[in-house]
Amino acid sequence: MYYGFDIGGTKIALGVFDSGRQLQWEKRVPTPRDSYDAFLDAVCELVAEADRRFGCKGSVGIGIPGMPETEDGTLYAANVPAASGKPLRADLSARLDRDVRLDNDANCFALSEAWDDEFTQYSLVMGLILGTGVGGGLIFNGKPITGKSYITGEFGHMRLPVDALTMMGLDFPLRRCGCGQHGCIENYLSGRGFAWLYQHYYHQPLQAPEIIAFYDQGDEQARAHVERYLDLLAVCLGNILTIVDPDLVVIGGGLSNFPAITTQLAERLPRHLLPVARVPRIERARHGDAGGMRGAAFLHLTD
């Protein structure tokens, strides 16, 4: 059995998958915020419960935000303060007496989608998350590409390209990002960025679901906003696709639930690509909230 953990700032979610990659059981508990020992106990207790339930010693994979293993073997995860700065992989491997694998949560999302029964035909899969922020991951021949610092796929921290500034206006504000830079695309393409763009142009503080509801009702202002957003997304994604050239792009995060993102994006891409380039297949993520657990479990299928 394959145990996949999706660990965030508020919850630790465990999913148990069989050899056919089907979810058999899941459980969630709150993430301890202050005590590393309590954090380790929470993970180990879930593993012990799964071992008892299924009568086996399952393999363990963990998806967690941040840098799973720095050069000195410690975790960097600002959203999981109890474990950040600790040698999490080594400590869990020792306590559980098995090889524990860690990866970035965005890589686990991409891995989950790449191992979808239909999508395994593609050698290079790109996951793109349009949620609270913008991120993603790259999967090549069923394995995540992490890079030495685990920042492969941090698409949200690319800067706005020149074509975007031409489209939006040269006086378009380059917003300061949480990373310390200015003009990172996640400030405009995330769910929060989607709402910020609307307020910037129309001076109305609406949230993304409200704007989308107006769009669905045929509101002209909301429709103009979505057109502008999709054009901006196409410009930025075109740069990424020119570098990566994937077979498939799978879009996740809250904005992936808005059908226009996946149905209208492809037609906007050709003018931002090289003439010889082919637009990849673009799909909405298929595994929803289970994707993080699923991808973490499948870290043991990448040998």
Swiss-Prot record:
It is an enzyme of class 2 (transferase). Its EC number is 2.7.1.59. ATP binds at residues 4-11, 133-140. SUPFAM superfamilies: Actin-like ATPase domain. CDD domains: ASKHA_NBD_ROK_NAGK. It catalyses: N-acetyl-D-glucosamine + ATP = N-acetyl-D-glucosamine 6-phosphate + ADP + H(+). GO terms for molecular function: ATP binding; N-acetylglucosamine kinase activity; zinc ion binding. Zn(2+) binds at H157, C177, C179, C184. The keyword Zinc applies. Keywords: ATP-binding, Carbohydrate metabolism, Kinase, Metal-binding, Nucleotide-binding, Transferase, Zinc. Pathway: Cell wall biogenesis; peptidoglycan recycling. InterPro entries: ATPase_NBD, N-acetyl-D-glucosamine_kinase, ROK, ROK_cs. One of its GO terms (biological process) is peptidoglycan turnover. The keyword Membrane does not apply. It comes from the Bacteria. NCBIfam families: PRK13310.1. Catalyzes the phosphorylation of N-acetyl-D-glucosamine (GlcNAc) derived from cell-wall degradation, yielding GlcNAc-6-P. Belongs to the ROK (NagC/XylR) family. NagK subfamily. HAMAP family: GlcNAc_kinase. This is N-acetyl-D-glucosamine kinase. It comes from Escherichia coli O127:H6 (strain E2348/69 / EPEC). The gene is nagK.
